[in-house]
């Protein structure tokens, strides 16, 4: 039914899953504070285009003589800045102004995609390109540089060493977020805010500070997912609306992993594999069948959500105050 070998399939699944890992880790941190940020797709989009803008103007200024360190750091810093601004905007609307989180998140996604398409289209016009895309192949080479031994250690190198550095950064961040949430006092305070902001406030925890920090840091992590997609997965090529539904997959991954960043590592690879499974179908397979296979991550997420709801185990539930604005005067 499928035509592929596992050694070549897994690296592709990993590369497809890394943006999801960045996005889900950032969203888990955000949701642990009680903020439901459905703007993650837009934030990832802004993170991607911000990195592209920084890289584009650096390549223009350097004139082809790129410094490896700057070629990496400028896009990363621009991506972090762009996604941070999106996170701050979301926090201002939902934490300070107490706007509805669901509506705000959806608006942020629409806004982020619009911003990305505007700047992406503007850069394409600057290049006078005949194709609707921006190619940053020179910068992409630095992001795609693999670990030593990737080409000389056979299947081991292909499975474990053949990825750009951001893939390993994503795994480290996920493990670090898991340790932070479960083994540190600030992590305990953050979870307390997400469970009951009024109780945390009564205990002397600064609810506003934790919500702002968790959401902004989570947004920056998610933004790196957009940068990875462009610079590594897409080989440095930006095309408007090329992200597809990866941002929504990252949100689905949060539910699938039951709000556990460490579980997201393997789950993102699973989702990545399911997402690209359709391309391994026989050539004659109908388009409708391929689209059904692309639905698998969402179907599995719904099944997990149903199972978790039926089990009713407290540790498997979302933060109790998720999506609820905190009104201190009602404490």
Spans of model-derived segments:
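Helix-loop-helix "hairpin" substructures at the membrane interface of multi-pass membrane proteins
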Residues: 158-237, 261, 266
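Membrane-interface helix caps of multi-pass small-molecule transporters
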Residues: 29, 53, 57, 85-88, ...
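Membrane-interfacial amphipathic/re-entrant helices at transmembrane-helix boundaries
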Residues: 1-23, 36, 50, 59-74
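Alpha-helical transmembrane segments within multi-pass membrane transporters and channels
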Residues: 64-115, 275
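Transmembrane helix-bundle core of multi-pass membrane transporters
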Residues: 112-182, 285-293, 319-331
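Cytosolic-side transmembrane-helix boundaries in multi-pass membrane proteins
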Residues: 195-202, 207-209, 281-331
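Hydrophobic core segments of alpha-helical transmembrane domains in multi-pass membrane transport
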Residues: 23, 48-52, 113-117, 167-178, ...
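Transmembrane alpha-helical segments in multi-pass inner-membrane proteins
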Residues: 222, 232-298
């Amino acid at each position: 039914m499928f035509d592929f070998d596992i050694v070549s399939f897994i690296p592709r699944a990993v590369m497809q899953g890394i943006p999801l890992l960045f996005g889900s880790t950032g969203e888990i941190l955000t949701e642990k504070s009680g903020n439901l940020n459905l703007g993650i797709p837009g934030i990832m989009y802004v993170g991607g285009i911000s990195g592209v803008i920084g890289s584009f103007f650096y390549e223009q200024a350097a004139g082809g003589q790129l410094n490896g360190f700057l070629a990496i750091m400028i896009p990363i810093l621009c991506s972090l800045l762009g996604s941070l601004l999106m996170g701050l905007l979301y926090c201002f609307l939902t934490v300070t102004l107490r706007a509805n989180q669901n509506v705000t998140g959806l608006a942020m996604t629409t806004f982020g995609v619009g911003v990305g398409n505007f700047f992406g289209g503007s850069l394409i016009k600057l290049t006078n390109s005949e194709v609707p895309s921006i190619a940053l192949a020179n910068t992409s080479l630095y992001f795609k540089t693999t670990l030593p031994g990737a080409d000389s250690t056979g299947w081991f190198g292909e499975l474990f060493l053949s990825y750009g550095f951001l893939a390993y950064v994503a795994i480290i961040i996920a493990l670090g977020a898991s340790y932070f949430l479960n083994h540190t006092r600030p992590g305990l305070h953050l979870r307390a805010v997400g469970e009951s902001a009024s109780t945390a406030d009564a205990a002397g925890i600064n609810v506003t500070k934790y919500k702002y920090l968790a959401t902004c840091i989570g947004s920056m992590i998610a933004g790196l997912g957009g940068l990875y997609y462009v610079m590594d997965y897409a080989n440095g090529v930006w095309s408007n609306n090329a992200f597809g539904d990866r941002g929504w997959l990252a949100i689905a991954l949060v539910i699938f992993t039951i709000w556990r960043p460490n579980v997201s590592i393997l789950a993102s690879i699973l989702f990545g594999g399911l997402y690209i499974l359709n391309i391994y179908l026989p050539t004659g397979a109908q388009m409708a069948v391929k689209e059904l296979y692309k639905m698998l991550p969402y179907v599995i997420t719904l099944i997990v959500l149903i199972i978790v709801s039926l089990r009713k185990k407290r540790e498997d539930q979302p933060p109790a105050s998720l999506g609820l604005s905190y009104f201190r005067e009602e404490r």
